[in-house]
Amino acid sequence: GDALKKRVEPLAAELGAHVVGHCDVTDPESMDAVFAELEKIWGKIDFLVHAIAFSDKDQLTGRFINTTRENFSRTMEISVFSLAALSRRAEMIMNDGGSILTLTYYGAEKVMPHYNVMGVAKAALEATVRYLAVDMGSRGIRVNAISAGPIKTLAASGIGDFRYILKWNEYNAPLKRTVTTDEVGQSALYLLSDMSSAVTGEVHHVDSGYHTIGMKAVDAPDISVIKD
């Protein structure tokens, strides 16, 4: 959509990327066309970054049990099946020893308010990572996921009480802060490069250690009385 286009084009220009295209992951022909074009331009690829998810934001609030069949199916198709579909196509033009990386969230492991079906989808995504890692391992192709802490992004804007979530993580994570996009990017670079040549099927947390916490930290303030 236009909202993403306005962000992608400047980023592509900054990085000197000459190939920017449209891909509809619900349309097999669209995905086929993208990889045919990449093969035509580059011949081979070294990695694939899967950073796509979708759900009706109106169904991320309230009770998960009220998720509609239509939204559940669409969420799973776009957020989960797309990784398998894109990986299958990428494998055909990927060099041996390549890397595939996707993005997940702690809501796959524990119930998070206002995440609902996306939490279920992310759990399925993490399972998909493990199965793909086995499928593609014989060629040395690695498949991993980054589970980042909350960051102010376009996707995060659809999550209710996001500012509260940011503050909660800041006060309760072992490092007493949230994470930055640069820190997530550095972890992605590690997982996409030969520095992680023996790492596959993993969910790598970049969340200031928040995933280790079981309850409110002893020294954390009462967030209900904290003003921004």
Q: What role is predicted for each listed range?
A:
Residues 1-71, 83, 87, 129-130, 158, 228, ...:
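Short-chain dehydrogenase/reductase
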Residues 13-17, 159-173, 178, 222-228:
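A short C-terminal helix-loop "cap" of Rossmann-like NAD(P)-dependent dehydrogenase/epimerase domains
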Residues 49, 101, 205:
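N-terminal Rossmann-like NAD(P) cofactor-binding module of classical short-chain dehydrogenase/reductase
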Residues 53-92, 96-138, 150-152, 210:
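Catalytic loop of short-chain dehydrogenase/reductase
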Residues 81, 145, 163-199, 204-208:
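C-terminal helical subdomain
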Residues 143, 147-158, 212:
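Short, flexible catalytic-loop segment of classical short-chain dehydrogenase/reductase
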Residues 189, 200-228:
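Short C-terminal tail/terminal secondary-structure segment
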